[in-house]
């Protein structure tokens, strides 16, 4: 959920496993993480982040309200302003997490001044939700912008349906599914037919272990694979998953 291009509010609600009451305060400590417990874990990362920086950084420049329950008898709610806890209470348990970030950069006006065009910020948020939806088709996503649902998926695993929502039905029909593997890697996804192109490389979506990346080597390899089938300065649409 975003309001006023995400500057007034960014709110994220999920029905996941939640955060325990004891861990909720720790989640906002810099470098605190529940995802690394031994050196071994550094080489077997299965999450989208692990450094313990994001929540600490966000809470230091905004007002944050978080409610979470991990199956306990009561859920816990915290309110933080400028990185400091100003309120702490319990509520009826609803499994999952509800995180609201309001008044971004309220205490650092210089940073607020140098934000990009508000419409660009909103487009960036929309774009990252699209990436998540393509990378995790079995998870349902909804994006609300100023009270209106602008994007929704159902978590049914149908990537074609997601492509049609992001682009359009015609583009989805022109995407070819592929897969291949060896002893070290598995590569699968969708690529467009040579006639379905764009003037920008931004439509080449590459994911490694579920994480969206920009890698010019892989990007150029994809373009080179099309060879002379592509017109000059035209690029394919792709969803490439590498595991």
Predicted segments, located by residue:
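N-terminal phosphate-binding caps/lids of nucleotide- and nucleic-acid-binding domains
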Residues: 1-243
């Amino acid at each position: 959920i975003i309001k006023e291009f995400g500057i007034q509010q960014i709110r994220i609600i999920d029905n996941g496993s939640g955060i325990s009451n004891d861990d909720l305060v720790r989640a906002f400590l810099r470098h605190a993480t529940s995802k690394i417990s031994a050196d071994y874990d550094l080489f077997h990362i299965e999450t989208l982040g692990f450094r313990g920086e994001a929540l600490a950084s966000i809470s230091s420049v905004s007002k944050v309200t978080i409610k979470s329950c991990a199956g306990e008898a009561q859920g816990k709610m915290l309110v933080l302003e400028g990185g400091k806890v100003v309120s702490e209470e319990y509520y009826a348990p609803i499994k999952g997490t509800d995180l609201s970030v309001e008044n971004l950069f309220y205490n650092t006006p210089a940073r607020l001044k140098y934000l990009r065009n508000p419409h660009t910020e909103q487009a960036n948020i929309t774009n990252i939700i699209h990436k998540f939806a393509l990378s995790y088709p079995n998870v349902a996503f909804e994006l609300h912008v100023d009270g209106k649902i602008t994007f929704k998926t159902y978590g049914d695993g149908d990537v074609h349906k997601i492509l049609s929502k992001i682009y359009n039905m015609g583009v989805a029909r022109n995407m070819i599914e592929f897969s291949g593997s060896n002893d070290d890697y598995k590569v699968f996804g969708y690529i467009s037919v040579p006639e379905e192109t764009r003037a920008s490389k931004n439509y080449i979506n590459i994911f490694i272990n579920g994480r969206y990346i920009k890698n010019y080597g892989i990007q150029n390899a994809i373009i080179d694979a099309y060879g002379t089938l592509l017109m000059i300065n035209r690029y394919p649409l792709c969803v490439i998953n590498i595991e």
